[in-house]
Amino acid sequence: MTDRGTTCPSPDSDSPSETPESRPTKSRAWLIAVCWILGVGAVAATRFRSQWDAYRSIHQWAANNGIPSSLRNYDSLLIYILAAVIGAAIVSKVLGGRTTETLRLSGSQSGIARMLALATAPMILGGIAVGLVRGGLNFDLSAAWPTFSSGVIRAPIGEELIFRGLLVACVARMIGWHGRVFWINAVFASLAFGSIHVPWNHDALGSWPAFLVTSAGGVWYVWLLARWRSLWVSIGLHAGMNLGWMLMGASGGAGGGGWIENILRVATIAVATKATLRMSKRVES
């Protein structure tokens, strides 16, 4: 909870670790390259890992020993976590600070829980209501777990660590949190985020709505990260919106859903945006 006079970090304020010594210089451009190589490498590894004989053998062994696919597929989250942590550790080693600070997983979290509760209410509560009306709300944990595990745990944590934590927050240690260069990098990170939500084949052209909506959502998540300077905001919203989508039984990914689903999604975006503008506004003395 946040007192009326409490605000989250202003977008114009620097964190304690952003000292003059750690501001961007041309000689540190290689750190940006390291972050992007790790990020792209992690995405490629998760996308193509099923083509590796050794990987298939391990998964077959796990399946034969009764390990369900919903648990076996946590290897994708592990890949994302390793890439993000390694990248943040390298940046922190060179520029100073802690790895968790560089990834924006630590520091002031004032007001975040309150904002997330308000913002995700339309999607989650609306999702429960819509699911009950449609008769598709599944209270069988064993049946709902695979979808919940993938959409509410693996995807929000892994994708936010890579596309906002590694490719935006870590890179911001070199280029700053403002200006054209920051937003150019943010757009490229968001396009990469959108690309993992469409097929990487000839069917991709038919998935352009999902690509555009997801990429735009990625830019919005970056804006939230820049305002709050906390990755937990985008992780929480990402998880909450996916949970609402799951409860409603919506189909079509980010570019799909009917008018009810999209009204609730817009409501969540509107509440989060308004709350962010109000709660992150600098208090004038």
Which sequence ranges carry the predicted segments?
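A generic structural micro-environment signature
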Residues: 7, 109-111, 234
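N-terminal, membrane-interfacial amphipathic/helix-forming hydrophobic leader that caps
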Residues: 1-104, 128, 243-285
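Juxtamembrane helix-loop-helix connectors linking adjacent transmembrane helices
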Residues: 55-72, 93-162, 168-178
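Transmembrane helix-loop-helix hairpins at the membrane interface
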Residues: 146-285
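A generic alpha-helix propensity feature with a strong bias for hydrophobic helices
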Residues: 12-14, 125, 202-205
